[in-house]
Amino acid sequence: MSHFKSKYHDELIANAAYIGTPGKGILAADESTGTIGKRLSSINVENVESNRQALRELLFTASWLFLQYLSGVILFEETLYQKTAAGKPFVDVLNEAGVLPGIKVDKGTVELAGTDGETTTQGLDGLGARCRKYYEAGARFAKWRAVLKIGANEPSEHSIHENAYGLARYAVICQENGLVPIVEPEILVDGSHDILKCAAITERVLAATYKALSDHHVILEGTLLKPNMVTPGSDAPKVAPEVIAEHTVRALQRTVPAAVPAVVFLSGGQSEEEASVNLNAINQIKGKKPWTLSFSFGRALQQSTLKAWGGKTENVKAAQDALLTRAKANSEATLGTYKGASNLGAGASESLHVKDYKY
């Protein structure tokens, strides 16, 4: 083991533990300009900076009741420097509510040479300098998304290794510059595979990821894991939440060290309600679970809100109420106490799956 110790060592551990506070989770609001444009177009709103700012202000200035269910918000670079209509930086709004600002630092995926359409994530060049700039701007954690797919021969060992080591290099660079790295090896739900295949692939990918993190001397106590839940493929028959929970927790038990403070699941195209119900089932599983099991949801926290808002100022209160409903549901799910929604809002049961999803 290396004798290297980041000057941010204690701060990293404290911030990772804070983000993993039981009952709280992360709002992923780090969509690229192109991706948020697709969200806005779905409600017939033009993708211009003023509308993106208005949506983010709606999200970040929701009532304190909403913010009490969050410990972190992941921002896109544009958003890190944006302000409310009254001129207050979003970073200050979040900090005053006790919510840590985070930042997406990867530059998207590119095809991995020598594979059948598999990808690797770019963005390591200049990452240290960017992390220092983001830390100075108020960010305290970061996100990097690696993407793997399940197929007849995928993911290949080459793809698993390349993505695991990319995540590890990103993680140690973040820690050297004061940012808690969220490690996100997402296995896409695309395909007709059953849950057993997803479980086996998830275990392989997570095992390789933690081997790489160890090789790079990453401080695990100062990291978070953002994995997929273990589910059947999008074209396969669905299974009960209890089955998803059993396979998901087992995969984590077999691969994720107890030193990791929290696992914050991605929603992976599940509907808002489906993601909450499955997270609740995961937290109801008995047995060894040394990590907080929480959420880092984007689409699965925002869909009802978008529908309620529709780009209209007069709908902001209704949209924030919808956001509060989903945030409260997911907070309860992290504690295993969510009872399900008796009256689902518009969009809450709508599948959010997009094939070959790009953030």
Swiss-Prot record:
Descriptive protein name: Fructose-bisphosphate aldolase, cytoplasmic isozyme 2
Keyword Cytoplasm in record: yes
Record pathway: Carbohydrate degradation; glycolysis; D-glyceraldehyde 3-phosphate and glycerone phosphate from D-glucose: step 4/4
Gene3D superfamilies hit by this protein: Aldolase class I (3.20.20.70)
The EC number(s) this enzyme carries: 4.1.2.13
Keywords: Cytoplasm, Glycolysis, Lyase, Schiff base
Catalytic reaction list: beta-D-fructose 1,6-bisphosphate = D-glyceraldehyde 3-phosphate + dihydroxyacetone phosphate
Subcellular location field: Cytoplasm
Pfam families per record: Glycolytic
Active site: E184 (proton acceptor), K226 (schiff-base intermediate with dihydroxyacetone-p)
GO cellular component: cytoplasm
GO molecular function, one term: fructose-bisphosphate aldolase activity
GO biological process: glycolytic process
Site residues by UniProt (Necessary for preference for fructose 1,6-bisphosphate over fructose 1-phosphate): Y359
Family: Belongs to the class I fructose-bisphosphate aldolase family.
Binding site for substrate: R52, K143
